[in-house]
Amino acid sequence: MANDTHTDDLDELLDSALDDFKDLNLTQRNGGVKKEEGDKKETESLPSGVQGLGMGLPDMRSKKKGKKKIAKEDHVTEALDKLREQTRETVKGLESLSSKQQPTGSDDAMVEDWIKQFENLTGSNDLESIVDTMMQQLLSKDILHEPMKEIGARYPKWLEEHESSLNKEEFDRYSRQYELIKELNLVYENEPNNSTKIMEIMQKMQECGQPPSDIVQEMDPGFDFASLGQMSPDMLESSPNCCVM
């Protein structure tokens, strides 16, 4: 009976992780991500409707309290199959923001390479390591640098045109956001493998909300940055009935 209960808990844990990863599908045009009641406490200090760029990312500076293990290898295999499809859609969604066209089939090849890395981690039955690796890949230079350059290039003109119509708090927030985007791009150019620094900058972006909607809409109508970063190792520490994302 104890073993059955443990297996059920693992099933629910994997289902919760995969459900949250589906929220990362940036090609969907469903108007944003549903928020759990607990999340409202973290965002109530922001203006109404503002959701952070990088919302939900774990704090890389804090120590992990432990690692979640998976007892059955078939659960990992099933999870990887689903993650392969969701990751492929996420990559395509991000690349839709960039004017730099990728060779046909490059997305699939990149995702398959990632999945091989994830599979190498399954020997330790450590789902947290898999999720951690996935986050590093999704925030890598290959994926985010071009979209961030495209967005950052539009800020100076936008800030100049809208300064008179924004209150001081809004203008300062968007200006801070622009500085963080420039800082992130510098890291991509000079320290592309510094995943800790990249993650920390993305966390700071949480405090600034999303980029101006007209900037993003100009690049790709319907695109929603709010779900970027919804996949987090911290969600594995939540109970099956309580999603922290």
Swiss-Prot record:
Compartments, as annotated in UniProt: Cytoplasm; Peroxisome membrane
Residue stretches of biased makeup (Basic and acidic residues): 33-44, 71-92
Give the record's membrane topology: Lipid-anchor
State the lipidation positions (S-farnesyl cysteine): 242
Prodomain residues: 243-245
Where in this protein does the record say Cysteine methyl ester is found?
242
Entry's InterPro entries?
Pex19, Pex19_C_sf
Major place of residence: cytoplasm
Gene3D superfamilies annotated for this entry? Pex19, mPTS binding domain
Regions of compositional bias (Polar residues) in chain numbering: 96-105
The post-translation modification note in this UniProt entry reads: May be farnesylated.
Sequence segments annotated as region (Disordered): 17-106
A single Gene Ontology biological process assigned to it is: protein targeting to peroxisome
Q: What is the reported tissue distribution?
A: Expressed in roots, leaves, flowers, siliques and stems. Highest expression in roots and leaves.
Protein keywords = Cytoplasm, Lipoprotein, Membrane, Methylation, Peroxisome, Peroxisome biogenesis, Prenylation, Protein transport, Transport
Query: What are the GO cellular component annotations?
Result: cytosol; peroxisomal membrane
Q: What does this protein do?
A: Contributes to morphology determination of peroxisomes, but not to import of peroxisomal matrix proteins. Required for proper post-translational import and stabilization of peroxisomal membrane proteins (PMPs). Acts as a cytosolic import receptor for PMPs and delivers them to the docking factor PEX3 at the peroxisomal membrane for subsequent insertion into the membrane. Acts as a chaperone in stabilizing or maintaining PMPs in the lipid bilayer.
Record-stated family: Belongs to the peroxin-19 family.
The record describes its quaternary structure and partners as:
Dimer. Interacts with PEX10 (via C-terminus).
Q: What is this protein called?
A: Peroxisome biogenesis protein 19-2
Question: What's the source species for this entry?
Answer: Arabidopsis thaliana
Q: What is the lineage of its organism?
A: Eukaryota, Viridiplantae, Streptophyta, Embryophyta, Tracheophyta
The gene name on file is PEX19-2
